[in-house]
C-alpha cells in the first residue's frame, strides 16, 4: 500500500503521521484498520533494559613512539586486543581486574565493561593501560595514559545480541535464594522477575520480521544506527499464539551505532548481585506501515502477549525445557500473578517508562524530519532452528 520511498518523502516534508506502539492501539480502535493504515506512516517501538551481549570497538590512535597493544585495560577492565595495533573491543560484561566475582558469594560486581562505556559516553576520563612484546615497527612495550571519548578516533557500539523478541519470566522453587541475570529470586516462589517492554517491544510489533531486517534504522541510546544481522541465539522457530506472537525468546537483533553520538541517560552500567556486570541500553526501532497486516501487528496489547514462567533454581540451569505456565504481560505489569494457586509478586528489569520515553523521542525525531527509515537489504530469517551445544568426545580421523 505504501513504499519506503513514499514514507521517507513524507518524513522529509515533515508531513508523516507517526504514533508510538502504545498510541496506535486506541487510534486503530477509533478509525478501523483500513482507514488507519492509509493515515499512519510510522509506528515507533522501544525497549530499555539489560543487554549483556553488547560492547564497542575502539581505535585509540597512535602514540609516539608507536605500540601494538596486545593486552589492554580500561579502568582495569580487560579489553580484547587480538586485532590491529590500536584497535580493541570492550565487552559489557567484562569484569575489573582482580574482581573477586563470586568468591565471596553472592558477589557484588561493582564495576565492569558496561560502566566503562557509561563513563566514556558521559565524557569522563578513563585510564588506558596497554602492554606489548614490541616489534621493529611498533617498538613501545608499555603505555599508560588517560583518555576521554573526545580523544578517540572511533568508538563504535557493535552488539551481537540485543532486543530479544520475548523472554522468560523467572521464579525460584528451591528453598534458598537464587542470583541470576534476571535479578534475585526469593525462595519458594516468593517473587517473579521478567524483562520486556511487552506491547512496546520492537520485535513483538513485527513478529515475523517483515519490516525489521538487515539494514533497518535503529535508535541506539540516541545515536542513529542499524541492524547488521540477526542476533546470536536467534531462534524464531518456537511456540507462538494464534496471532503469531512468540511465547518464548524467539528473535534477536545484532545492532551497531556511533557511541560518540549517544546520550548518557540511555546507556548505564549495571551490577547484578551474584551474577555479574552488564549494560542497560535504550533501543528504539521505527516500523513503516506499508500495509494493513503490518499495522495490525503493531496494535497488539499486553493481554495478548505471553511469557513462559521458568524455574531458575533447576529447570533453567539444567536445561530441562520445562515450563511451569504462561502469563500475560498485562498480568506481569499488574504487580502480581497467580501460579498454581499462589499469588506471586512480580518485578521487571526492563523499564516501561523509559521505553515509552524513547518511543516518544523517536516519534519526535521522525516527525521533525530528522530520522529517515532504511529499507532492509536483507531479511531476518524466520525459519532457522536453534542448536544446543553437545558434550562429546573428539571424533577420530
Annotate the PLM regions.
Residues 2-10, 15-397:
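Anaerobic metallocofactor- and corrinoid-dependent redox/one-carbon enzyme cores
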